[in-house]
């Protein structure tokens, strides 16, 4: 959630930054108007409470002296009714403010490029040259079906479209990747955690998926439980409503999980293969830091994921997302896009974001520095998406006969 006090004092700056994220100016104005109205009504309630306290003391003094208190008691009753009305209005405005504020995205960092869509994302650097093939490279779904690694028909029979059964060496390679990724991340100082795949609505609110993106989630009927869209959600919320001693920062965690998404806005996109699935696996990085350290930690997380791709021998590039392509909670995002020779283009394999204090404000994650409590900064990103890494290896390491070589670093995991 964005800082409402800063909006009040820097409305034009916030408005420009949110406009760059395609947020209508009326949304922010409504938020500010509600915030200011709430402040006024809270002050009116406090004034009525002060009157109530003063008159109550006066009644006590008069009663002890034997004087008539009838008139004052009548005034107290009238004031009490006014207090109740004012209190109800304050509660209504607080609910309205929370509802409006919870749907306003994070503001962008100053160095984020302005843009209208993903065509305006900026390539920072490219790592490893794509391999030159002396044959026409196939896409992963053709390779996988021919080898018996990817069984789309059985996935569809069991669950419907956008589900896949991995078999034989395809399943082994997927498992090898998970173990390799976990070992790589923990060697970089990330603590391995294992979390539930079902979380409650408060947890999803903390990281910003609710209330705005409920249609993309799978909900358990008649329960306050949802399947996680990413392990960022439970891992970040391990520290929900907690105060962390400053000496414990930064906190760096990594987690393997299955992820579940309805992909509500993806009809007609990537309908073949494993690029876009309702259920997929990834290994996540989550960091919690002091505000002044988060920019440096973002760079460290990007380097971790990029170095992993280098070790796997996969050509990729670093893309800074433009304002309009940034996610709801992100202040800044670096995407890593891997080269897929079968498709002849780069595709996202990791998205690493600094949310600054946006999630921390929602989830009430603070740190204690001396006598002062302050909001932490939270960061998250894939290191890496398992299915897309599998795809990238299949396409980049394919041979003319349709066989696939295994990267040297993975052989011990197979």
UniProtKB/Swiss-Prot annotation:
PROSITE patterns: AA_TRNA_LIGASE_II (PS50862). It is found in: Cytoplasm. It comes from the Bacteria. GO terms for biological process: selenocysteine biosynthetic process; seryl-tRNA aminoacylation. L-serine binds at residues 230-232, 284, 382. It catalyses: tRNA(Ser) + L-serine + ATP = L-seryl-tRNA(Ser) + AMP + diphosphate + H(+); tRNA(Sec) + L-serine + ATP = L-seryl-tRNA(Sec) + AMP + diphosphate + H(+). ATP binds at residues 261-263, 348-351. Transmembrane segments: none annotated. CDD domains: SerRS_core (cd00770). Its EC number is 6.1.1.11. Keywords: Aminoacyl-tRNA synthetase, ATP-binding, Cytoplasm, Ligase, Nucleotide-binding, Protein biosynthesis. The keyword ATP-binding applies. Its main location: cytoplasm. The keyword Cytoplasm applies. One of its GO terms (molecular function) is serine-tRNA ligase activity. Pathway: Aminoacyl-tRNA biosynthesis; selenocysteinyl-tRNA(Sec) biosynthesis; L-seryl-tRNA(Sec) from L-serine and tRNA(Sec): step 1/1. It is an enzyme of class 6 (ligase). Homodimer. The tRNA molecule binds across the dimer. Consists of two distinct domains, a catalytic core and a N-terminal extension that is involved in tRNA binding. Catalyzes the attachment of serine to tRNA(Ser). Is also able to aminoacylate tRNA(Sec) with serine, to form the misacylated tRNA L-seryl-tRNA(Sec), which will be further converted into selenocysteinyl-tRNA(Sec). Belongs to the class-II aminoacyl-tRNA synthetase family. Type-1 seryl-tRNA synthetase subfamily. This is Serine--tRNA ligase. It comes from Campylobacter fetus subsp. fetus (strain 82-40).
């Amino acid at each position: 959630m964005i800082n409402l006090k800063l909006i009040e004092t820097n409305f034009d700056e916030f408005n420009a930054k949110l406009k760059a994220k395609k947020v209508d100016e009326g949304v922010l104005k409504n938020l500010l108007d509600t915030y200011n109205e709430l402040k006024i009504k809270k002050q009116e309630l406090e004034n009525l409470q002060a009157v109530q306290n003063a008159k109550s003391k006066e009644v006590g003094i008069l009663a002890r002296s034997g004087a008539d208190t009838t008139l004052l008691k009548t005034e107290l009753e009238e004031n009490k009714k006014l207090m109740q009305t004012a209190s109800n209005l304050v509660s209504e405005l607080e609910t309205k403010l929370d509802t409006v504020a919870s749907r306003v995205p994070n503001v962008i960092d100053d160095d984020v490029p302005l843009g209208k869509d993903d065509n305006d994302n900026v390539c920072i650097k490219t790592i490893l040259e794509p391999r030159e093939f002396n044959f026409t490279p196939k896409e992963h779904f053709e390779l996988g079906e021919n080898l018996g690694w990817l069984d789309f028909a059985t996935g569809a029979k069991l669950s419907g479209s956008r589900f896949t059964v991995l078999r034989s060496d395809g399943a082994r390679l997927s498992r090898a990747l998970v173990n390799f990724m976990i070992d790589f991340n923990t060697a970089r100082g990330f603590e391995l955690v294992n979390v539930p795949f079902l979380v409650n609505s408060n947890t999803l609110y903390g990281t910003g998926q609710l209330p705005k993106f409920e249609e993309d989630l799978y909900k358990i009927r008649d329960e306050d439980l949802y399947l996680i869209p990413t392990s960022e959600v439970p891992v970040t919320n391990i520290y929900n409503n907690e105060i962390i001693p400053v000496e414990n920062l930064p906190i760096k965690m990594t987690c393997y999980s299955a992820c579940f998404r309805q992909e509500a806005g993806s009809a007609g996109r990537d309908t073949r293969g494993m690029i876009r699935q309702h259920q997929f696996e990834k290994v996540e990085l989550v960091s919690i830091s002091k505000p002044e350290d988060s920019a440096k930690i973002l760079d460290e997380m990007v380097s971790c994921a990029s170095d992993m791709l280098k070790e796997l021998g996969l050509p990729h590039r670093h893309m800074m997302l433009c304002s309009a392509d940034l996610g709801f909670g992100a202040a800044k995002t670096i995407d890593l896009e891997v080269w897929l020779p079968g498709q002849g283009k780069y595709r996202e394999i990791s998205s690493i974001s600094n949310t600054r204090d946006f999630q921390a404000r929602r989830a009430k994650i603070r740190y204690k520095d001396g006598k002062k409590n302050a909001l932490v900064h939270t960061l998250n990103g894939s290191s890496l998406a398992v299915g897309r890494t599998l795809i990238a290896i299949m396409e980049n390491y394919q041979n003319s006969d349709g066989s696939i070589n295994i990267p040297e670093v993975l052989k011990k995991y197979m």
